Amino acid sequence: MTTLTETTHPGGFLVWEAFRDYTRETVTIAAGTLEPGTVLGKTTASGKYAAHNPAATDGTETAVAVLWGKADASAGDVAAVALIRGPAIVNRHDLVFTGTLSEPEIAAAHAALVAVGILVR
């Protein structure tokens, strides 16, 4: 019998949002193949989004958004929808971080999301 594995769903991390036309926007993803719920940072120089990286110094070290659906930017920039502001509440267990983050780094990312109105519960 084949074993099926359910992957993340677009918007599956979202618990509540006030106004979807206000909280979500189409953004440009600069690099990587990212899953729904990936925490994003914004590159200061280009204004493009990429996976949050606390070790970076290009702007992506600060968590500012959450990717709505899968985005494959492995061959170049792609447009994708992201939750970029609140009021909204997301499930912390459904957020995706790239790399291996420490608990303090995850807590800092959660706090940065709260700063833009995205509550992490």
Locations of the language-model features?
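Surface-exposed, low-hydrophobicity beta-strand/loop segments enriched in small/polar/acidic residues
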Residues: 1-121
